[in-house]
Each structure stands twice: as structure tokens, then as C-alpha cells.
């Protein structure tokens, strides 16, 4: 069974986690300063930091949130993608290394030659692995400005789908700007 569960917006996270009822605003309303944060006891920046580290998925209130998210990522990288792509065990290990390497360095301007060399992935296979991770919802790709079929080949930057993944997989505290 395939089911796509989108992550929570910051507003949705606040409404669920704090029991609030914040309305949605247009970008113009936000940029013009017509939005007032109505809850004086909580500051948006503190709440936003909590959201970045562990508020994207609806199960954020689980006491074992990080372990559950790690398990989901592991399931996708070690089982779901390899089964879909008919990968062998060696390829699965390389896919896992790629995901871990990307989590350490996002946003990432891909240097395909370095990744291929460091991870032992062939030139023809690396774009497929990145596409699989994107299709699984783990990565977002920013395409390079190109024309024709070149647009399918070039990736300007690679981002993790959401910051919670970086907090779970990275060895250090992720840069908030990512």
C-alpha cells in the first residue's frame, strides 16, 4: 500500500502541539507585518527551533521521535528503494552511504566526480541513486538552468526534504539556514 503523508507546516505544528488555532495568512500579509503572533507566553523563534528539530511529521509528540524517524529512513533506504530498483546488497550499502553523506553536507552543490570516487558509485548510477532518494521523499533537488534534455541531467543543489532528517542523520547540529 502506498500512501503519501505530507509533513506539517509550522502553523499546523503549532496548532497541534500547543492546542492553538492560528489562522493561515498570505505571504503578502506576512511580509507587510499584518500578522500578530497572539501568544505572548511562547516566542515564535523558540517554537520554530523545536519544529526544525522534530516537528515536521505528525508523530512529533512520540517520546522516541528520533528513533522512529531513523527507522523510517532506514526502511526506505535499506528496503523500499532497493526492492523497487532491484538493487543488490552492495548497491544498497552505497545508497545508504550516499544518503548519510548528503545529510552531513546539505544544502549540497553536487560534485558528482568526488561523490563517485568517495562512495565507489559509477558515473551512470549516481544520478539514479539521487533520483531514487528524491522519489522516496528524502531529498529535494533544485535543477540547474539548462535547456532541452540537459535539464534532466543537471542539479544545482540538493536539499533534504525537511530539516528533521538532518537532525536525525547529521553528526553535528545542522545549520538552521539549510
Write out the residue ranges for each language-model feature.
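Interdomain motor-coupling "hinge/lid" segment immediately C-terminal to the ATP-binding subdomain
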Residues: 1-99, 103-104
Amino acid at each position: 500500500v502506498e500512501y503519501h503523508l505530507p509533513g506539517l507546516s509550522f502553523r499546523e505544528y503549532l496548532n497541534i502541539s500547543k492546542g492553538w488555532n492560528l489562522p493561515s495568512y498570505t505571504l503578502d500579509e506576512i511580509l507587510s507585518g499584518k500578522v500578530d503572533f497572539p501568544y505572548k507566553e511562547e516566542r515564535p523563534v523558540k517554537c520554530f527551533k523545536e519544529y526544525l528539530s522534530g516537528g515536521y511529521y505528525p508523530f512529533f509528540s512520540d517520546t522516541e521521535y528520533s528513533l522512529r524517524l531513523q527507522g523510517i529512513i532506514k526502511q526506505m533506504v535499506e528496503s523500499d528503494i532497493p526492492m523497487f530498483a532491484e538493487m543488490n546488497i552492495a548497491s544498497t550499502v552505497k545508497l545508504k552511504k550516499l544518503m548519510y553523506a548528503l545529510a552531513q553536507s546539505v544544502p549540497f552543490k553536487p560534485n558528482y566526480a568526488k561523490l563517485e570516487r568517495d562512495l565507489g558509485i559509477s558515473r551512470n548510477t549516481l544520478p539514479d541513486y539521487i533520483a531514487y532518494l528524491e522519489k522516496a521523499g528524502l531529498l529535494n533537488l533544485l535543477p540547474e538552468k539548462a535547456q532541452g534534455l540537459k535539464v534532466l541531467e543537471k542539479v544545482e543543489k540538493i536539499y533534504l526534504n525537511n530539516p528533521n532528517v538532518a537532525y536525525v542523520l547529521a553528526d553535528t547540529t545542522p545549520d538552521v539556514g539549510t
